[in-house]
């Protein structure tokens, strides 16, 4: 039942568990070595941010290529859509074969989930760039690189930022899947380990930290998106 402390730890137990995890740590992952909430959070955050950064770099590059080259897009986009629609959980056995049980597997799951929304949104933004401005750029002798930098990419920024917000959520899912299903050290692995041993309060602490982490990442990207939108609005008002 909902009042069962094993199934639903009361707030007082969760607070006590958080204090112990922060101050002393607890033995976990089948080892006598104590792990603290800080070390678990840093491990997960490190994998999340590094994987997300890699997805931004590769997602932007691939998105620009697909947005500027229609033939390449016709060939590649069905594969992109298939990867986007495939649940990452079913790829876990293959990822273990490719990368083993370690840091690289964690990074790959984050990258795989986060890069595809960035690719899709960047490609859409590139295609929706204003053709009149592009024609003006061609008429004054701008190179492809100059067009991308000064004309096309500025117009695609709102699409890219929207893609980053979606990607952030998928990156969080990727890091948790990686840690839980590959039994990796981190908040996700800690939730699985503690839950299996009916230490519900400890598991709830890790769940709450993951929720705060995800909300902070997505909210910061949303703030960046709104700042850019207000800046563009001011630019248009000055032009008129």
Where do the protein language model's features map onto the residues?
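Periplasmic/extracellular loop-to-transmembrane helix junction in inner-membrane transport proteins
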Residues: 1-53
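Alpha-helical membrane-protein architecture signal
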Residues: 15, 34, 38, 42, ...
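Transmembrane-helix boundary motif in ABC transporter permease subunits
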Residues: 50-80
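Generic hydrophobic transmembrane alpha-helix motif, especially the helices
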Residues: 77, 81-117, 124-125
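Transmembrane alpha-helices
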Residues: 108, 112, 145-178, 205, ...
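Short cytoplasmic-facing helical segments at TM-TM junctions of multi-pass membrane proteins
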Residues: 118-163
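Hydrophobic alpha-helical transmembrane segments of polytopic membrane proteins
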Residues: 188-223
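Short cytosolic juxtamembrane segments of multi-pass membrane proteins
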Residues: 225-240
